[in-house]
Amino acid sequence: LDLARATQRQVLYLRTCELGYVSQFLSALPRQTAYDIVMRSALETYGEERRGEAERASEAMLRHFDIDENLWELYPRTFSGGEKLRLNIAAAMIKRPRLLLLDEPTASLDNASKVKVRSLIEQLKAEGTTMLGIFHDLEFMEGLCDREYNMQEGAMS
């Protein structure tokens, strides 16, 4: 697809169905619960006609990232940094995108959460998802990347 000539509908399809983005910061609509955030991403993939599957996948993803069920119906603005990041990762990864952009996906996560993130990244990679990430946690990256570029003093090494 030539993005310079793509229609708005084609670009929208790419953004909602083919691309995933994990930021170290959660940007969620106000009055949207943790469950709603993940479910919205799931529905973009599954569609309204497969709502039951989307619900089950959303619940499984929230559990995978240890987001306590007591938090599912709460607004994430009250969450810790690690909880927000895990929620953000769950919402991006539930889509099983073809391209996943990762901006510090392990920032503010404890080791147990990092293991879960790595496990899902490895699974997506095995399924053919292409990923481009920015990491400061070099230990986390070890053995995960096919190619690695290091920025030192403003230049790649």
Predicted feature locations:
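Q-loop/switch helix immediately C-terminal to the Walker
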Residues: 32-44
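H-loop/switch region of ABC-family ATPase nucleotide-binding domains
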Residues: 135-136
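Helix N-cap at the start of a conserved alpha-helix in ABC-type nucleotide-binding domains
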Residues: 111-112
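Hydrophobic anchor residue at the start of the ABC signature
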Residues: 89
